[in-house]
Amino acid sequence: MNDPFNDTHETSGPIERDPNGIDPHKPGAKLDAGKVRPSLILSDMARAILAVAEVGTFGANKYTDGGWQYVQDGIKRYRDAMDRHRLLGAIEERDPDSGLLHAAHEAWNALAVLELMLREKEAEVREASHG
């Protein structure tokens, strides 16, 4: 998997470059053209990220910190939870248990599914490369 946070000059992939055309060996150069820009989510969607973090905090307090990662059949079960919150969000705005927005619960579950899928994929790639 590509590491979007890697600031090294790659030689086996696309050549990295400064978005302003500054030579990599000159002061002020930063080889980040074309790299992932986390600020587009963290700054531009700060309210949504905080709402999802509230769901994560609620879950950690109700269960355990990070315990969601060890739920059996997590992808399937978090998908079901995501769908439940989507359906309930059409009927009511807030989850009665947490008092938080169903949309925030839906987003948290979508992120949990995505995280588990990406981890599975990484494990498959690691296994394949180590034979």
Question: Which residues does each predicted region cover?
Answer:
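Intrinsically disordered, low-complexity regulatory regions
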Residues: 1-131
